[in-house]
Amino acid sequence: MRTIFILATLLTITLTSDFFAQDKDFVSTREMDRINWMEFKAIVPSKTNTVLLPTGTLEPQGVINNGADNTAPFAMAKTIARRTNALIAPTLSYGITGSMEAYPGAFQITEAAYRPFIKQILEGLVKNGFRNIIIINGHGGGQTAVLQSVAAEVAIERKVRTLVINWWSFASDETKEVFGEDGGHAGWRPAPVNGQV
């Protein structure tokens, strides 16, 4: 048993050393759920104080996957993280689905449950040393308003910077140019993005 403990300790030290020797553009080192607490402590806030939080939901999206609202913001976060020296928090895969909950595969979280959940996550990110919190939202409707409201509350109360980005707002002109229309839910906007991920 003692031998296993010593080998595990040596392996941990070796892997931790390898982590710091790696090129920081290596994506897995940007994902908070893929590093250990010692690596996290060495990175936040001394090397970065910015975090990307992908949010979405599970709901029908026509012919594409029910998790498209999660897939797109996470893929964007991986690209943005490399360019902005940010870490990526785990994707929040459940949201305020409302009108889609009658369809198979949809999951509805009420606003009354979602609002304090999001607030506690944002406060936890602040507590862990993040001063810049960027929410990359993959789902519209009431979820967008809740995210914006809670992010503003946390920014004021905790003296940090927050930003909510609805990625589809930036894709509107491109989808009009390529497809001749703006798209929308389960339309041209999410399908190409999720097809490229």
Give residue spans per PLM region.
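Active-site histidine-anchored catalytic micro-motif
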Residues: K24-I35, I96-W188
